[in-house]
């Protein structure tokens, strides 16, 4: 086992990364090894997908499968060995299918089929024992003694960034958004990473390419969500419990939420969002369901307590899931799509009757809590609509600075930095937030500036796209570069989606971003220095010191 993809990975003087019997996330060594083998098989599929494309062969089904299966290897997504093995076996079948199509096309064209690298040649074992025996060939740091640590760090930056992009591709696909060119670029990068490079410049360029690719993917996801559900609008949301039977929907998949709402109409069941599903409450399409009553709980790391206290059924539509046995709710939590936990019921297809039956059998909330509301829904359209008023307030001096504070949440004590930062921002500044990092301060009162709320909840982590659009619009109005705006970006990271959002911002030339609370363990000191010199990227320090720098206070 070797896994170093998330913030909570083991860090010791002897080396970084989870490499024992179990990772800090709860992932067993066997699961980690099977995930590495799955990635290896997917890279082999991409090798043939690239070659097939050169001869005009495009398989949309395979284009969708590869990022979806890759998504299953993200932090806190799938801990079920059987499901991971099934993905690997399907990858082997697709690779064989593409190989046959490619070789037939070569024969028809009268050309010789090209040799493929080792990553596209492995004959996958048929049992778990055989697959685990093959896993060392796919170990991410298998050549660590022969490769400089900076090269290893760049490889992992690319791999983990592409994982984040794969997740957004799958979210977009669920909403009907696919693009053959995007899929082609994805396969090219997967294929490249399947042949471990020692070219630092090429790896760095690839990291930026992943950022650019993800920008296109975020635009696709934005289109998918707004075409399906309308543009989010400022919305007041209750965050307390409501009497009645209950279902809690966590993750990121709004299509699943829509299906659950449709299937619970007239059933006497209240539906709550959780975590990154909170932004769904701002979409017009969901407002026609009166039994979508609010948001319950906070960010992913608190789920073992929050789900244990929730008196209904829980559905995990995507990341992040953690051990449901700790809170003794494994018999009433359900997984969807790429999510998996051993022993937890997995919902195939679009029939949520098992979830509904479980909710009806449980007690539900026995009384209404006194409501506590927050305002959400300041995504792209709402931000652009407010842009003229924002511009006028900037020109008048009422608004002097913008902060984007968001990203992933986590359970480290030093994440209180983001709470204190938000509370310490000047009263003449606006705070944009997104991702589950918002839960560090989204229930606090920040007031407004001439009717414009100081705290603007942009949405999910992928809605960084909305914030980027606002920054571009403001830069155009003020005839300046984005980096010349009075804008400070402070991103909390935990896993691979945050990594690819960061790569997206860097690829767009955005500078002076702060990340925290700790730097990724796979980034060496040399790489961190290069990123600081090239982009001004730096780690958070103290709220007082960082604010002085961001506000140019002597």
Curated annotation (Swiss-Prot):
Entry's cofactor comment: Binds 1 [2Fe-2S] cluster.
Molecular functions per Gene Ontology: 2 iron, 2 sulfur cluster binding; hydroxylamine reductase activity; metal ion binding; peroxidase activity
4Fe-4S recorded as keyword: no
Record PTM Cysteine persulfide, positions in chain: 408
Record-listed [2Fe-2S] cluster binding positions: 3, 6, 18, 25
GO biological process: one example: response to hydrogen peroxide
Protein EC: 1.7.99.1
Pfam families hit by this protein: Prismane
Binding positions for hybrid [4Fe-2O-2S] cluster per the UniProt entry: 252, 276, 320, 408, 436, 461, 495, 497
Record family assignment: Belongs to the HCP family.
PANTHER family: HYDROXYLAMINE REDUCTASE
Protein name (record): Hydroxylamine reductase
Taxonomic source organism: Shewanella baltica (strain OS223)
This protein's encoding gene: hcp
